[in-house]
Amino acid sequence: MGQVLPLVTRQGDRIAIVSGLRTPFARQATAFHGIPAVDLGKMVVGELLARSEIPAEVIEQLVFGQVVQMPEAPNIAREIVLGTGMNVHTDAYSVSRACATSFQAVANVAESLMAGTIRAGIAGGADSSSVLPIGVSKKLARVLVDVNKARTMSQRLKLFSRLRLRDLMPVPPAVAEYSTGLRMGDTAEQMAKTYGITREQQDALAHRSHQRAAQAWSDGKLKEEVMTAFIPPYKQPLVEDNNIRGNSSLADYAKLRPAFDRKHGTVTAANSTPLTDGAAAVILMTESRAKELGLVPLGYLRSYAFTAIDVWQDMLLGPAWSTPLALERAGLTMSDLTLIDMHEAFAAQTLANIQLLGSERFAREALGRAHATGEVDDSKFNVLGGSIAYGHPFAATGARMITQTLHELRRRGGGFGLVTACAAGGLGAAMVLEAE
């Protein structure tokens, strides 16, 4: 076992997570169509503060993330502070770590708490795949800058005359990695082939995810942690996630064609997480501050770890790399965990990470460790379903996972939970949570 790194303040306080909330998650261009991420962020933070009954002035910092950036609101965190009635003096800044963005936001607030610069803060993220920054071609962008500097009408007309019809076409946001040109689905296909993961295995995991998420809603387990969203023109509220298939059937999965490798692929729209809109946030504070306010924490942040690997081959292995570090820093092993919640970007990616966590060879050759991190116990794994069912508003997923895991730990009488995710750019994140 390597070095244990206790997450405590100088006074010995643990980092408490006292509350968490999210909007329902909605598939792209459905319930939240036309609502930008900043408004989703305001919605969830405003409701989180109202439910917690914590005075706004208690919150000294807000760290928030957004992956699909909107040029008109580059600092989503500050806009949320200004748009929710929080104290205008509340420090606020934005972060981005692709699909692990709200993991990063939580880590940043935790670091401020440990440094003693704040005693309470909010971390979270929001994304909209329905309100996108549609750009212009590079040639048109350059001409527009030059036109703005031109002094005469003839100079402006001369500049515009250089453009062709194709230069005027809108440019949608990139869906591929900047450095490689590979889409996330292409990487998932790589991983399915590298680790021998079949179409049947992927469909089975997706089916399991939907079944468990549907059951979680049916049992009322998510009601406390998901707000009702009132959407303009306010005719009908959104109460639950709208991607979950309550009637999920393996036979239906088998009918779908591959989405990326059309000829030989196994990754489909059904065994991948969909483009989604939503927001999620958590309130963190020092343990002593929570006691002062009479709050009973949901749980505590025991450890966290971030990792990075090469992007050209099988880059969505973040959980396999970051989990052993987070466990080591928490002074725990896989067998000590009560729950394991892994982000399901794709069924292929999820199954590959499960395989490598139990691989002695991967531990030796890739991680330089003597033994495998540990087998993943199916009875502890994604017990309420995962991102394939709930959806994945990129910056909000980590906060969803943290809140969901802490609530489930409390229902089970406490214990330790691991939340972990892969992210674009070959990044990985893992956090160990504790509930009493």
Curated annotation (Swiss-Prot):
GO CC terms: cytoplasm; cytosol; fatty acid beta-oxidation multienzyme complex
Key word Lipid metabolism present: yes
Gene3D superfamilies associated with the record: 3.40.47.10
Subcellular location: Cytoplasm
GO molecular function: 3-hydroxyacyl-CoA dehydrogenase activity; acetyl-CoA C-acetyltransferase activity; acetyl-CoA C-acyltransferase activity; enoyl-CoA hydratase activity
GO terms under biological process: fatty acid beta-oxidation; fatty acid beta-oxidation, unsaturated, even number
Keywords attached to this entry: Acyltransferase, Cytoplasm, Fatty acid metabolism, Lipid degradation, Lipid metabolism, Transferase
Active site residues per record: 99 (acyl-thioester intermediate), 392 (proton acceptor), 422 (proton acceptor)
Pathway in which this enzyme or protein is active: Lipid metabolism; fatty acid beta-oxidation
E.C. number(s) listed in UniProt: 2.3.1.16
Catalysed reaction equations from the record: an acyl-CoA + acetyl-CoA = a 3-oxoacyl-CoA + CoA
Function: Catalyzes the final step of fatty acid oxidation in which acetyl-CoA is released and the CoA ester of a fatty acid two carbons shorter is formed. Strongly involved in the anaerobic degradation of long and medium-chain fatty acids in the presence of nitrate and weakly involved in the aerobic degradation of long-chain fatty acids.
Family annotation (HAMAP family): FadI (MF_01618)
Protein name: 3-ketoacyl-CoA thiolase FadI
Species of the source: Escherichia coli (strain K12)
